[in-house]
Amino acid sequence: MADPAFVPLRPIAIKDRSSIVFLQRGQLDVVDGAFVLIDQEGVRVQIPVGGLACLMLEPGTRITHAAIVLCARVGCLVIWVGERGTRLYAAGQPGGARADRLLFQARNALDETARLNVVREMYRRRFDDDPPARRSVDQLRGMEGVRVREIYRLLAKKYAVDWNARRYDHNDWDGADIPNRCLSAATACLYGLCEAAILAAGYAPAIGFLHRGKPQSFVYDVADLYKVETVVPTAFSIAAKIAAGKGDDSPPERQVRIACRDQFRKSGLLEKIIPDIEEILRAGGLEPPLDAPEAVDPVIPPEEPSGDDGHRG
């Protein structure tokens, strides 16, 4: 007989979660039913993964089978990254419970007219301006790049930051200047958050519209909608403080992460991402796919889902 005091682990909606936690140097495990980080002295720190959108695991972390199972049950995305979040090596997938969302995304991506409509809607939302008529996806991509470079230049001027161009090398992280390091750290935070939302909603990170051919193409598409009004100003702000000697003694990347976390919370970004994705895909002008006529319900009816549509719980 089931324990009446036992509460099944079920995902909660992305919009009700905190954003991102970076972890390093410790073992992640489940002890006494709690998700914990255990350091080399055996000190445990509890981490409420059920209330997080994403865990970023840096070098020096190990994770047990029980910890991964718990993250999967509560729908917390786990991403393995390089030191300071500079590389993405792998990601656990907490979503995948819905095929209709993925098929609708793929239908829009495969139809050239619908794809162009989606890209135009992204452009409109990103710059609050209608894109010129009769422009291809490649032309819009080029126009977008010009506008983004100008935004970077203006923000650098606003915050009095020395700025040459967006340059960084994954193999020589410390060789980059402080503004570029801050920007890379900030965008890594945004990418993790957007991927968690995409998976939670039942979409595929790899099926992009403006970006193509990358495992995170749609992540880049979605992140670009918010980048210049969220993490980019935050990165330049931190770079300016460091240049003026007003930052703390922690690495620039840590200062940026803390500032981005606070910015995500204040802006309510997690509440916006999934509804915005739905509206953008509807701009393609296609109808969502219907169930196949031969489709049948499972013999054992599934439990009423919790969380977002893509969560398995």
Swiss-Prot record:
One of its GO terms (biological process) is maintenance of CRISPR repeat elements. Residues 288-313 are annotated as: Disordered. It holds the Pfam family Cas_Cas1. It comes from the Bacteria. Keywords: Antiviral defense, DNA-binding, Endonuclease, Hydrolase, Magnesium, Manganese, Metal-binding, Nuclease. GO terms for molecular function: DNA binding; DNA endonuclease activity; metal ion binding. Its cofactor is Mg(2+); Mn(2+). Its EC number is 3.1.-.-. Mn(2+) binds at residues 144, 211, 224. CRISPR (clustered regularly interspaced short palindromic repeat), is an adaptive immune system that provides protection against mobile genetic elements (viruses, transposable elements and conjugative plasmids). CRISPR clusters contain spacers, sequences complementary to antecedent mobile elements, and target invading nucleic acids. CRISPR clusters are transcribed and processed into CRISPR RNA (crRNA). Acts as a dsDNA endonuclease. Involved in the integration of spacer DNA into the CRISPR cassette. Belongs to the CRISPR-associated endonuclease Cas1 family. HAMAP family: Cas1. Homodimer, forms a heterotetramer with a Cas2 homodimer. This is CRISPR-associated endonuclease Cas1 1. It comes from Rhodospirillum rubrum (strain ATCC 11170 / ATH 1.1.1 / DSM 467 / LMG 4362 / NCIMB 8255 / S1). The gene is cas1-1.
